[in-house]
Structure formats: structure tokens, C-alpha cells
Amino acid sequence: HTSAAVGRPKVDSAAETIRALNPDVEVIPHRTRLTAENALGLLDGWDVVIDGTDNFPTRYLVNDATVMLGLPLVHGAVLGFNGQVGVFDARRGPCYRCLHPAPPPAGSVPSCAEAGVLGVLPGIIGTMQAAEALKLVIGGGQPLLGRLALLDAWGAHLREIPVAKNPACPVCGENPSITALVTEADTCVVPRTPEVE
């Protein structure tokens, strides 16, 4: 997004940027919030889902929907000087809830607005996610399935941790307790500031 896009819906700005970069790419924007009611319909039919969401309720909703639809999920997250990327596919390995069964308690994780984000970090993590998605689509390379890449941009360290499938996972485990989509309570709500005129 650019400064000129401030105030515009992100979906419109993103679609415009993608079309400008490659006019041969078909862009199908959906100007709607992802909800428990529409997630399965919006995500069904795609080959890979890439999650770049900035809140826990949507992150868990996307995970649960991809598990229910049998789709691979390329996860990415950033906060401060840190970022992470992983591939979750419950058909072949763990899902996001295998790593984090439930959202963190309210107030335990600062929001991006509170902690900030190093400006280049979303681009780095997004590029890593794109590489993972390409590996999944072409069936090549070694996707980060069952592995989470952790980037410490401040210290210039990249490390990897294993993520195992959890037999007790509430959505992809042996006896799942989550069998329908629900929207988790938002644990990281930041009050909106009044608009400056």
C-alpha cells in the first residue's frame, strides 16, 4: 500500500497494485469481512490460502476453515522486529491450532499499534510466504510444513522450530471439539482513536 491509498479499503489498494505489477493476473477482490458465516464459501475452491491477517480472531478463523476445507495454509505474522512464516496443512501435518490451541489471554500480547512493526518486515515475511505458496502450487522444494521459520530482524537471525501435529488439537486432532466455524473473541482490541480533521 502507498500513502496515496490511506483511507481506501485495503482490498481495493491491493487489487490496484497487483494489476499494475502484472496486468495478466486475474484479481478477484472481495470487499467484505471474513466471518464464521462466509469463510467456507470465500475460501473454498482455492489451491492455497495465504494468511497475512493482523488479529487473532481472523487468524484462528482462517486456520479452522482451511482445516475443514482440506486446504494448505501459508501463515505469516509480524510484531516489532520479529516475524514468522509456516505452512499448515492438517492432511499432511499440523494446523495452526496444533501450535497455539487457543488465542492468548486478553492483554498478554501487544497489538501492532502498541508494539509497532519494523517497516520492512511485512515485505520480508510476505515474500517468504509467496515463496512457500509457490512451492505448494508447483509441488517443488521443501515447504515449511511442520516447521516455523522465525526471523529476528533486529539481530539478523533466522531460525526454525519444528511444529508437531497435536493428537489433542481441537480442530484437526483425533477427536476434534471444533466442528463448526466460530469467531473467537478479540483479545487484542485497540480502541480507535478519533479521526483528525
What is each PLM-predicted segment?
Residues 1-197:
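Adenine nucleotide-associated cytosolic modules
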